[in-house]
Each structure stands twice: as C-alpha cells, then as structure tokens.
C-alpha cells in the first residue's frame, strides 16, 4: 500500500525510538492459574480476587460511616483511633413502620449521606427510600419508588426529592408509607419523547451528570429542559418481544441540527417556574450550573456550537433575566468546561474556577464581577480533583499529577498562592474524600504493590488506618509486569507504557504480542495502581503465552492541553503514529515474534484497532474492535465536533478518518463486536463497515451482543472476553 508523507515521516522518527529504563513487578510463576470468572467483572468469583474495600465509605459531617456485615458503622475522625458506634439492620427494622420491613436482615441497605443534616442518611431499600436520622435513631420519612422513577435528586436538607417519570419532573416530600410519591408536585406536565425534563443533556459531555440542581437552602430547583424535536431519531430495536419493538434515540450527529436546551427554575414557595433568558442562538451548550450561596443568582458556563468559546454568565433566579457575563474563555482548538463555580466558605462573591487556559488544568480565584483575583495553582501538571477548603477557607485542597502523570496525590495550598504541600507523599494513586468541614480526609490508596489501603487523616493531627487489604492473588501464578517510557513520533514527548509478559517467560523463545489500545481523550490506561493498572484479561492472556502491551499515546488524558489537542481535526493520525512507535519498541525486543502482533480496543479503541488493521495490515495479523467508531460523520455533535470541528468545516479530516472508504485495505483477521442497542456508538457504524467490506470483497468476522449497549457488562462480560480470547488463540 502506498505510504503517505505523514506515514513516512513518523516511521523515520520511530526508527530512532528507544525505550527509557523500565521498572518491573517480579513474577510469581508458581501457583494456580486464573480463570476468566475470577479475573473479569461480572465473573462468578471476581470479587474473591478484587482487593478488599470498605463498603459505602463516606463522610457525615466530621464522622465517617460505612457498612460492615449487617451493621452501619459510625466513626468519629480524631486522627488516632476509631470511636465506633454500630447500628444493625435488625435495629433499623425495629424502628420501621409496619409493612416496611426489609425482606432480609443479614445486611444493611445501601445508603448515602446528605449534604446538610449531619446525622441524616437516605437508605435505598427494596420498598423505597427511607430517611433516617443517625443521631436521633429514628425514621424521618419514607418515599415509595418504582421502576419508572429515575434521576433521584435529594434536597440539601433531605426532606424532598426531585425525580423524573415519563419525561416529566416531579418533587415529592416524604411522608407515611404509601404517601410519599402520591403527594408529589408535578413541576412539568408536557414531557414527551421529544421534550425531556430533568435529565442530563448534551450527551453527558462537559461534565454533565444529572439534570436537576437544588439551591443551597433547598428553596429552588434548577433543571434542564431539552427539546429534541429537531433531531432525526435513530432506531434502537429490542428483539426480545415476539414482535420486535423500535424505540427512537434522539442522537444529533455531527453537522446536523442539535437539540435545544433551556434551564428552568422552580420556586417551591410560590410554585412558579421561570426560564433563563439565554437568547440566541439556540444551538449552544448550557453547562456547569451553579448557585450563588444566597440563591439569588444561577451561573451557567455557556459554550458555543463551535466549542471554541465559553462564557460564564449570571442570571437572576427570580426572573430568569441575564445579569452579566463574568468572563469569556477562548481557545483556537476547543474549550471544555467540566466543573461549576465553587464559592469560598462564607462568601457570596468569591469563587474558584477551573481552567486550562495556561495549558494545564488549574485553580483560579475570581469575584462575581468577573475580576480575576489570582491564579492559585501553577505548573506543568494537572489538577484532577478540587476537593474544597480548610475550615477557615484560607487553604485549598486538591488532587493533582504534580508528582507524576502516573500518580495522584492530595495537596493543600494557601489561597494566596505559593508552594503546594503534599499531604499524601507515598508513591502511587490516592483517591481522597475531604470532610465537609475540611478538617479530615479519607485516603484510598493503591500502588503497584499495595492492593488497597484506606486511611482516615485528621489533617495536622494524625491518621488512623481503616483497612490494609491483603494480596488477593496469593497462591496464584502472576506474570511479570514491566513499565517504562518510549518516545512519541515527534521525537521529544515521552509516552508511558505497561507490558504484561508471558507467564513462565523464557527469553530464548519467541512470543506473540497483543497491543491493547484506546488513545483518545478522557482516558489514561497506564497508572501506578494495583498490578500497575494491568487488567484481568491481560493476565489471562499472559497465562496463554501472550504478551499484552499498552501505551498512552498523545491525545490521552492528564498530560495537559497540548498533549491532548495535537489530535484536533485529525483523529487517528497522531495516535496511530505513536502506537506504531510502540510497535517498533516491541520489535526491538529479541523475544517478540514480529509476525504475530495483534491489536484490540473498544469504542475509540475500536476505531483505533480498525484503523491500525487497515493502515498497517503488514504489521498487525489479528485485530478485535469493539463498539468501533467507523465514520465520524455518524458520531454525536458534542464529542465529535469538539475534536473534529463540523464536517462542513473539516471535510478532509472526516474523510481521512472514514474507515468505510478503506474497507478494501483489510488484509489480516479482524473481528468487530457491537452491542445491538448501543446508544453511544450506534450499531450503524459496524453494520455499514460490513456492507463496505462485502462490496470490497474483504472478509471481517462479526459478533453481536443483542441485549447490550455500548459495553458488555455483568456476567456476559466473561462470555465477551472468552470470545475475544478464542479469536486470538485461533488466529494469532
């Protein structure tokens, strides 16, 4: 196949690629071998080999709570030891009204603490929701629920819940058993398939995870209203009924009309709803809604359709009128606000804003006139989670990649700026929860050699270890896991990789290698977590004599804007160049059988897998592409146009990434897998690729999961990976 100029350039760079010194986890070659039922989520024995964890661990004021056996455990965080109060399912049953007993008393129900009341929890039972006051030890209210109830959102004080049923939005107040939902207020009444209230919008991009937003005191509820009538529906077919049923999916594809979103505010005291006067154009993205502490203003980060401009606007909550634009952010590639405003404790006019304006995600202090007071954090690293403030509101707490892109540590910094202080210096991945008053943290820690360690730290006063998980792999054979860096195709950017070696590795032998690929934004596959972030299937294939290699190419997450945005308007090109540098590294290893290299990936990784098989069929013998994007014209607007621009603006980029036009280039064995009811990468993608292959006289293999969406989850995931395993063992 004729090489493009771009391919010739990156191949010459990759020829000079050498791996920098790597580290390795020593293998344990003696012991039993794993099964897929033990290694894959959904497997019958998966949780026997999953590092032990603390169930339901979360803060309740300055106390932390979790489930242990059939007890809810309530501990005071004092930095030294656990002061434990226990409350069992049997104790709870004794307090429940007649007719609301749990069907079993051998386990405490799942729960969540509420933002305000320090002793308030909501219990999720088989009959509905139970409000429970831990301190007073009494049931405070009940909500009946059913399978039609969705998108539950509790008010800050926990006495009301917003929910969606049949596309309409309701607010219910807890009452006696059987009265909860029947006493609900209908906030909207005209909901339909094409007019949806209270749900996440814009395909859940821009950090949008829900569609309702309570004001701080619970007196108002902001909500999304999404008109989809201008979007042409895509059919999703359920084949289980005797006569198959088609349901419309309102999926706005790149370059086509988008849905129109507005924001309403319901005032509980008056029963009145006002809509924000967001004006024209209607095709824009209303993201990251946040309330002022006094409930008078609702702030919205508004992104234009081109996604190169973000305006942070203020609206009057009483009238819906536009008040002011606080500031505007622009970027020649794209903007992507992911976080709402976070106000300083006790302040109604100063807040923290997260932005990548200097090339890295950092924290900025603003006032509500739009004046930038200062940039608080700085450096060539990313803030990955802003946790909150200390009790005085003078210090900020956050997680970041400052120590390494492979790690997350918990830091504090004075709000006036200065040096950061690492409060979790142990090398690895720290996932933290800051207590509501900012005085303590729960630190859930993993490293390549630490399965899980849970520590409760009273900041500045001491720590208490709640859990040190044992190695769940003891007694089983484990392959060697190597990690290190290679150079990207630009010759100057280091890329992190992980390499799972074949079990019982003999350097004198030759082994096949499978490249597991994703490569796109918002994903990082190589981290310093348990087993060096190696997945169960990698270990399973190592048992069968395969090596599995993964490299986070440019375009992937947590390495800054320039690292990610290099793919803009040309998806699949830079990522593929970097993946081929990884292949060159593999070929430089004496033990690699260069004639037996395979590739596997899902979603964006499915696109990459198919692309690699079509472009480098002389290198990759076998590929398995799951849920693949085949033609970006048929992907949704929010993600697709962010990274590609609209098809009308970038026809060359869309054309270069359109794999339908290259079906005739298939040389090796390629199996495509798709969920028949996939709402993310619609089934149309792989079906049309099959049709293109028929016309081109090429012969991929194909597997469909009729009952699954974008990912095959639950027990069927074991079946999925047995299918993938058989394909590689048969053909590679």
Curated annotation (Swiss-Prot):
Task: Supply the enzyme class, top level.
Answer: hydrolase
Note the coiled coil stretches, chain numbering.
none
- Give the Gene Ontology MF terms in alphabetical order: aminopeptidase activity; dipeptidyl-peptidase activity; serine-type peptidase activity
Record's signal peptide? 1-24
Q: Which reaction does it catalyse?
A: Hydrolysis of Xaa-Xaa-Pro-|-Yaa- releasing the N-terminal tripeptide of a peptide with Pro as the third residue (position P1) and where Yaa is not proline
UniProt keyword list? Aminopeptidase, Hydrolase, Protease, Serine protease, Signal
Cystine residue pairs: none
Q: Which domain of life is it from?
A: Bacteria
Instruction: Name a single GO biological process.
Output: proteolysis
Q: Does the keyword Hydrolase apply?
A: yes
Q: Which residues constitute the catalytic centre?
A: 603 (charge relay system), 678 (charge relay system), 710 (charge relay system)
What the entry lists under InterPro entries is as follows: AB_hydrolase_fold (IPR029058), Peptidase_S9_cat (IPR001375), Peptidase_S9B_N (IPR002469), Serine_Prot_S9B/DPPIV (IPR050278)
Asked if the record carries the keyword Lipoprotein, the reply is no
**Enzyme Commission code:** 3.4.14.12
Q: What does this protein do?
A: Serine proteinase. Releases tripeptides from the free amino terminus of proteins. Has a requirement for Pro in the P1 position, but is inactivated by Pro in the P1' position.
The record's section on PANTHER family has:
DIPEPTIDYL PEPTIDASE 9, PROTEASE FAMILY S9B,C DIPEPTIDYL-PEPTIDASE IV-RELATED
Q: Which family does it belong to?
A: Belongs to the peptidase S9B family.
User: What's the protein called, per UniProt?
Assistant: Prolyl tripeptidyl peptidase
Organism field: Porphyromonas gingivalis (strain ATCC 33277 / DSM 20709 / CIP 103683 / JCM 12257 / NCTC 11834 / 2561)
């Amino acid at each position: 196949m004729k090489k493009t100029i771009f391919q010739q350039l990156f191949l010459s760079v990759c020829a000079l690629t050498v791996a920098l010194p790597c580290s390795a986890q020593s293998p344990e070659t003696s012991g039993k071998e794993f099964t897929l039922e033990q290694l894959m989520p959904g497997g019958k024995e998966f949780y026997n080999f999953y590092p032990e964890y603390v169930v339901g661990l979360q803060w309740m004021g300055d106390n932390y709570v979790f489930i242990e056996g059939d007890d809810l455990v309530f501990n005071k965080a004092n930095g030294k030891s656990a002061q434990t109060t226990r409350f069992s399912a049997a104790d709870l049953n004794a307090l429940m009204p007649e007719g609301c007993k749990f069907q079993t008393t051998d386990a405490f129900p799942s729960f969540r603490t509420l933002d305000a009341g320090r002793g308030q929890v909501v219990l999720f039972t088989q009959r509905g929701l139970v409000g429970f006051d831990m301190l007073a030890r009494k049931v405070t209210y009940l909500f009946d629920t059913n399978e039609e109830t969705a998108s539950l959102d509790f008010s800050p004080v926990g006495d009301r819940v917003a929910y969606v049923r049949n596309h309409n939005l309701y607010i219910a107040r807890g009452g006696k058993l059987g009265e909860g939902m029947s006493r609900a207020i209908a906030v909207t009444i005209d909901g339909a398939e094409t007019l949806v209230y209270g749900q996440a919008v814009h395909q859940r991009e821009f950090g949008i995870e829900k569609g309702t937003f309570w004001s701080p005191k619970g007196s108002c509820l902001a909500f999304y209203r999404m008109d989809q009538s201008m979007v042409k529906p895509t059919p999703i077919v359920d084949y289980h009924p005797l006569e198959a049923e088609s349901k419309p999916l309102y999926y706005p594809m790149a370059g086509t009309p988008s849905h129109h979103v507005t924001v309403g505010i319901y005032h509980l005291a008056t029963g009145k709803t006002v809509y924000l006067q967001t004006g024209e154009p209607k095709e824009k993205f209303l993201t990251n809604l946040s309330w002022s502490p006094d409930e008078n203003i609702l702030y919205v980060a508004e992104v234009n359709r081109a996604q190169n401009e973000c305006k942070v606007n203020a609206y009057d909550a009483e009238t819906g009128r536009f008040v002011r634009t606080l500031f505007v952010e622009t970027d020649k590639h794209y903007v992507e606000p992911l976080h709402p405003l976070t106000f300083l404790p006790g302040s109604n006019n100063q807040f923290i804003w997260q932005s990548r304006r200097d090339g890295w995600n950092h924290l900025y202090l603003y006032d509500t006139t739009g004046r930038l007071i200062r940039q608080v954090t700085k450096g060539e690293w990313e803030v990955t989670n802003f946790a909150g403030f200390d009790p005085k509101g003078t210090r900020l707490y956050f997680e970041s990649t400052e120590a390494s892109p492979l790690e997350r540590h918990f830091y504090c910094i004075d709000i006036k700026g200065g040096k950061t202080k690492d409060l979790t210096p142990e090398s690895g991945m720290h996932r933290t929860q800051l207590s509501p008053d900012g005085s303590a943290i729960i630190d859930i820690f993993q490293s390549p050699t630490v399965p899980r360690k849970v520590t409760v730290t009273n900041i500045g006063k001491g720590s208490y270890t709640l859990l040190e998980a044992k190695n769940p792999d003891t007694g089983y054979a484990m392959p060697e896991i190597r990690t290190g860096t290679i150079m990207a195709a630009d010759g100057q950017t280091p890329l992190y990789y992980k390499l799972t070696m074949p079990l019982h590795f003999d350097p004198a032998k030759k082994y096949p290698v499978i490249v597991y690929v994703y490569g796109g934004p918002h994903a990082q596959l190589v981290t310093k977590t348990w087993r060096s972030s190696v997945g169960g299937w990698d270990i399973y294939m190592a048992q069968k004599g395969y090596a599995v290699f993964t490299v986070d190419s440019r375009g992937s997450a947590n390495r800054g804007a320039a690292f990610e945005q290099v793919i803009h308007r040309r998806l699949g090109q830079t990522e593929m160049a970097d993946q081929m540098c990884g292949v060159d590294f593999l070929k430089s290893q004496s033990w690699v059988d260069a004639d037996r290299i395979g590739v596997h990936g899902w979603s964006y990784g499915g696109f990459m897998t198919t692309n690699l098989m079509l472009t480098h069929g002389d290198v990759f013998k076998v590929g398995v592409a799951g849920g693949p994007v085949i033609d970006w014209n048929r992907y949704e607007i929010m993600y697709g146009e962010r990274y590609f621009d609209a098809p009308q603006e970038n026809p060359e980029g869309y054309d270069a990434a359109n794999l339908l036009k290259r079906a005739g280039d298939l040389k090796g064995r390629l199996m495509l897998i798709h969920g028949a009811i996939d709402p993310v990468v619609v089934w149309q993608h792989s079906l049309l690729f099959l049709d293109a292959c028929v016309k081109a006289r090429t012969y991929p293999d194909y597997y469909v999961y009729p009952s699954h969406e974008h990912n095959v989850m639950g027990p069927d995931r074991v079946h999925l990976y047995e299918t993938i395993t058989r394909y590689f063992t048969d053909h590679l």
